[in-house]
């Protein structure tokens, strides 16, 4: 993903790291986490959100599967945290004051946190 980001946006700086601990305070303009939360145990979500807000100057964007997504049995066999994610993520994002928008009905949601400068 980063390789393609640099291809389409030369001169921009994209970095990846441990989402729970990476970065210095207010080090990045925008922090994103793409299609990861449904792969992570519930306990990690809060740590990731706290850290993302800490290292962001302006905005945090979380993109993941929609909470109205209906996973198949085959998907659930390899995605042990998906049902827990679907059941709990909206409340957690609300607790952190993220705004939710459905990007693709039944498939993709996006949550945005805007920091006051």
Residue ranges and their predicted role:
Residues 40-51, 55:
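A short, conserved alpha-helix within the catalytic core of class I
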Residues 36:
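Hydrophobic adenine-recognition pocket in adenosine-nucleotide-binding enzymes
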Residues 1-22:
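Class I SAM-dependent methyltransferase SAM/SAH-binding core
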